[in-house]
Amino acid sequence: MLRHKEPYVLYRKLLGFYPTDIYLYEQACLHRSSSICEQGRRINNERLEFLGDAILDAIVADILFHKFKTSKEGFLTNTRAKIVKRESLNEIAVKLGLDNFITYSMRTSSHNNYMFGNAFEALIGAIYLDKGYRYCKKFVETRIIDPYIDLEKISKEEFNFKSRLIEWGQKHKVDIEFALIETIVDQDNNPVFLSLIHISEPTRLLS
């Protein structure tokens, strides 16, 4: 009996609550390099990652909307982007201890910089399916925002859109090239760079 209870206890320590459908959380921690086959389908965390990405964006937007009541859309969008960028999600995943739950091929870990952040998004997707939006938002607020993210501080940090675009390209396996077209000076005498961005077709990996 203890063997059956142990996963629930471990996930309780990670999440702060007992999961109802533990299968969702186990799937959230299953990297594509260790996919399993069930009824002819490959099972891994990619679908949950897709869902969690959207849910996390919505939750962070919700939190920022009520936190910064007079701020404009551009400010809110930039602040959200800084919170959900891949480097931040990787760090949060490690601080939570999520990295200890992920099942993956050892040869994958050496060159997958975003595995932990991707698993974190999958975890958000699992919580949403298991407990609903309100519960998921509470998890983000109490287990992520409150202990690890200073909203006032991060809202004032400069944001590098070029790095964000490169990060997006790496996640979706597309090559991005930048070509400087023109340099001008704005009304405050700051340089403004106009660049042309070329995005290639996604790379399809055979497995």
Predicted features along the sequence, with ranges:
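Double-stranded RNA-binding/processing signature
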Residues: 1-200, 204
